[in-house]
């Protein structure tokens, strides 16, 4: 069952980030964070430092997108 993970970190450019992702395992959440931050800000993995990965409840989530994903039972792709 997927869980919501809060990922906190910073980059070598001085930017701090807090991101919420839905993933099965903490490792998958870290990979998703590397992908999202890297693509949004054109950074490599070596430039991204992840400080904390914590599972959170759906009530604690700030992102509406994450809340909607957790509320859906099944996703169909056509």
UniProtKB/Swiss-Prot annotation:
Lineage, broadest ranks: Archaea, Thermoproteota, Thermoprotei, Thermoproteales, Thermoproteaceae
Family, similarity comment: Belongs to the eukaryotic ribosomal protein eL20 family.
Keywords: Ribonucleoprotein, Ribosomal protein, RNA-binding, rRNA-binding
Gene: rpl18a
GO biological process, one term: translation
Superkingdom, taxonomy of origin: Archaea
SUBUNIT field: Part of the 50S ribosomal subunit. Binds 23S rRNA.
Pfam families the UniProt entry points to: Ribosomal_L18A (PF01775)
GO cellular component: ribonucleoprotein complex; ribosome
GO function term, MF aspect, one: structural constituent of ribosome
Name of the molecule in the record: Large ribosomal subunit protein eL20
């Amino acid at each position: 069952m997927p869980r919501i993970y809060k990922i906190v970190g910073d980059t070598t450019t001085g930017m701090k980030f807090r991101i919420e992702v839905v993933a099965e395992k903490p490792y998958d959440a870290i990979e998703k964070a590397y992908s999202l931050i890297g693509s949004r800000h054109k950074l490599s993995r070596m430039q991204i430092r992840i400080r904390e990965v914590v599972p959170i409840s759906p009530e604690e989530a700030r992102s509406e997108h994450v809340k909607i994903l957790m509320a859906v039972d099944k996703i169909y792709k056509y």
